[in-house]
Amino acid sequence: MSFTAPSDPVNKPTKVKVSQLCELCHSRKALIRRPKNLSKLCKQCFCLVFETEIHNTIVANNLFQRGEKVAVGASGGKDSTVLAHMLKLLNDRYDYGIEIVLLSIDEGIIGYRDDSLATVKRNQQQYGLPLEIFSFKDLYDWTMDEIVSVAGIRNSCTYCGVFRRQSLDRGAAKLGISHVVTGHNADDMAETVLMNILRGDVARLEKSTAIITQSSGSPIKRSKPFKYSYQKEIVLYAHYMKLDYFSTECTYAPEAFRGTAREYMKNLEAVRPSCIIDIIQSGENLALKAKKSNAGKRVVKFVDGNRCARCGYLSSNNICKACMLLEGLEKSRAQVAIENDTSADGAALKLRALEKLSF
């Protein structure tokens, strides 16, 4: 009669099914299934693969030149925090020979940007990188909170987008930097493609899908090393690497059109995980058909034609978009002052002042 010893639940080795093992190392348990190719990886292999993919994107697109000074658009959010960490890591690992500077813009949103900038300042200490901060108030004499009080919340992203893009360029120029790197990821780019299609604005597809953009005559170029990186994987990488980032959504973001596109993208991704890259590639193909070029592959330069007659910033029109928005804000502020003045004499004086406003 045979006797079988009782199993020891403590010392009994745990058998992991082959299907649950990491497809790269075949030894550790897989913890993630990547949406872009459905590969199953462990924590360590995922981080290594993610870093290697970013490096390959940088090399394949020749993003950096040795000796170049590069500004990382740092907001304190997950994308820019991972980007700053990644560039510092890869620059040390592969010897790109670049100088990295954190460049932040303070839009003036109390309870949001002031907290996120505190995160950026911690990142500065953690990564040992220099930090420069420029504010809307200093550059335009307006904060986003002031803009919203005059223009309304529904238009907030229009103002913020235009002023922020120009602020990054102005900040970089003041620092003598000709290359700004941003944390735009695959989800962001797919959303932009979708928004342009919904607007019927096919002409913008080339710029929205290019990994490097630069206006003709401008010394500032921009690049997006995370073009092919899914937002989910960026968040997961930040979690695994225990990175310090700010995760609160902008106070004014829920009213943005992009939020609608984002929700639609999430629904699509639930059905077809590869839809994000598919949409980017579709945008590239549509841009190629609309204009014979190599959109998304090399540097895409855009002809602006001249400089703004008011501020000197590059513009396709006589007056740049930022100055046009500022003109509207100043007129609105003057009109609000008139409406709030209960005295007839005061209102009349302000009305005459409004009529004389020139920009």
UniProtKB/Swiss-Prot annotation:
It holds the Pfam family zn-ribbon_14. Gene3D superfamilies: HUPs. Pathway: tRNA modification; 5-methoxycarbonylmethyl-2-thiouridine-tRNA biosynthesis. GO terms for biological process: protein urmylation; tRNA thio-modification; tRNA wobble position uridine thiolation; tRNA wobble uridine modification. It comes from the Eukaryota. InterPro entries: CTU1-like_ATP-bd, CTU1_C, Ncs6/Tuc1/Ctu1, Rossmann-like_a/b/a_fold, TilS/TtcA_N, tRNA_thiolation_TtcA_Ctu1, UPF0021_CS. It is found in: Cytoplasm; Mitochondrion. It is an enzyme of class 2 (transferase). Keywords: Cytoplasm, Mitochondrion, RNA-binding, Transferase, tRNA processing, tRNA-binding. HAMAP family: CTU1. Plays a central role in 2-thiolation of mcm(5)S(2)U at tRNA wobble positions of tRNA(Lys), tRNA(Glu) and tRNA(Gln). Directly binds tRNAs and probably acts by catalyzing adenylation of tRNAs, an intermediate required for 2-thiolation. It is unclear whether it acts as a sulfurtransferase that transfers sulfur from thiocarboxylated URM1 onto the uridine of tRNAs at wobble position. Prior mcm(5) tRNA modification by the elongator complex is required for 2-thiolation. May also be involved in protein urmylation. May also be involved in protein urmylation and in invasive and pseudohyphal growth. Belongs to the TtcA family. CTU1/NCS6/ATPBD3 subfamily. This is Cytoplasmic tRNA 2-thiolation protein 1.
